[in-house]
Amino acid sequence: MKRCFALLAASLSLTAQETAAQETGADAALAEGIALARQDRFMEANAALLASQRRFPADARFLLELAGVSYRLKNLAGAKRRLRQALRLDPANNYGNEFLATLHLLDGNLEAALSRWNRIGKPLLQEVVFDPVPILHPTLLQRAVTFSGGQILTLRRLHATERNLDLLNVFARRQLDLAPFGNGRYVATYRLLPAAQPFRGRWGTLFALARGLPYQAVRLERTNIANRAWNAHALYRWDAQKRRLAFDLAGPLGKTPSRAFRISIDGRDERWDLPGIWSPDNIYQARLRRAAAEIGAYFILREKLTWSTSVRTSKRSIAGAALDDAFDSGWTVEQRNQIDLPIFTLPEHRFRLTANAGLRTGRFLGRAKSRRILGGDSAVTANWLPQAKGDDWELRAAFYAGGVGGVPFDEYFQLGMERDNPHWIRGVAGSRGGRKGAGPIGSSFVLVQSGFDRTVLRIPFLRVKAGPFFDTGRAAGFSIPQWHSGTGAQVRLLAGGGVAWSLIVGRDLRRGEMVFYSTVSRFF
């Protein structure tokens, strides 16, 4: 027994000696690499540190020094890669987290910088300034921005602020910059570009009216009414096939940016051609007259979760033979609910995955009979900026699905390109001769959109983005259930005030038709 204890003691002593020798060897190798770097012999330092890192793979110090050498060699991607490797070995390392956060900040990737800074209790803010100062009620602005001087800017606070500003919906562009102040503190500068017309007064009104003239429509908009973030939108369309008169008013409830209201009224007089309900040769013509009103509210429940609820009522009259329940005239009363939630983000790789889900319940009081309305829809959207800095390249993909029962045909899901439709298969027409009904229509649908954009022109107050797309989808429960696909290119002109003009040149792969379509909208 004594001999066993003696052998164990000798083994422990030998292990301790080997560990001490390894530490001494690692210190010497590290000192050699640092000395070469201080002499500006960066290539030699890189080779020496890399060889030593292979000898001591569990020592994060070599990776940290390699990151510094890569930075001096202007290899920023290599520096960030080495820092991430080092922080996997030593997650709480102050120097590594500070270094990596600073590199992300230089790239303009504030979320990634905060994801590293917050691990070590940084960055501490000296003050928050606005440049320029937003024309917004001071109480609204103070409550919308959830961080201030003397606080640590966390991802949680940043996300809560971004949600509040989204709900206010008065800024076309936002940018938050951090600059060192001293003593380890930072000054946060918020640059909030308001949604504005290129012209003011009479010329601004005329410009707003002229935007819709190519589409036989005029649109009036007023944003940030009385500096309280109330936004009003009015639309009049005199197209003989789809007349429309609509008004929408939205804004925060009281002076709380995390709660908002929305009131809308919508009147339509439309003529529809509905081919392929029973066979490809059948075309059913219908005239729809509908008036609708909706009142709703939006609530930010957490920094990432938004819930909206509304009550909607509408009355419709459908001229033509009532071939089934979908063509019955009458009243509808519904309650609609929706939640929006970012479900997955990789700030350092600039990837974001978001989702939303909606539920609608109600009653259709038709002339023939009354029936229950029940339906829902959901969406998952992925967005990736592949470059470490800037957004000249952007890849997007989205999946949508939904179903509803008990509603008239005009409440079905419509997948063709039409300005009144929320879901598009780009390249597939949604109207023929100006009449709705040409695209896939049904009580249930599946839609997948994909594409990428590249900035091809950037000048003051104007940006042009273009890129290819491929969309595919299927609607069932009304028209013949078939998969429709479209491919082509989309060009977007983004003006500084938040106005976007889009041109789509696509091909319907099922019908073999070329489709050209354009639209004007807001992009914030």
Tell where the protein language model's regions lie, with residue ranges.
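Positively charged n-region of N-terminal signal peptides that target proteins for export
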Residues: 1-3
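Bacterial N-terminal signal peptides
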Residues: 6-15
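Boundary at the C-terminal end of the N-terminal hydrophobic targeting segment
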Residues: 16-21
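Alpha-helical segment of the N-proximal tetratricopeptide repeat
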Residues: 24-58
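Periplasmic polypeptide-binding modules associated with outer-membrane biogenesis and secretion
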Residues: 50, 56, 61, 68-209, ...
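Gram-negative/organellar outer-membrane beta-barrel architecture
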Residues: 157, 161-352, 418-433, 438-441, ...
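Transmembrane beta-barrel strands of outer-membrane/channel proteins
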Residues: 203-207, 218, 232-238, 263-271, ...
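C-terminal outer-membrane beta-barrel translocator/porin domains of Gram-negative envelope proteins
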Residues: 334-468, 476, 505, 509, ...
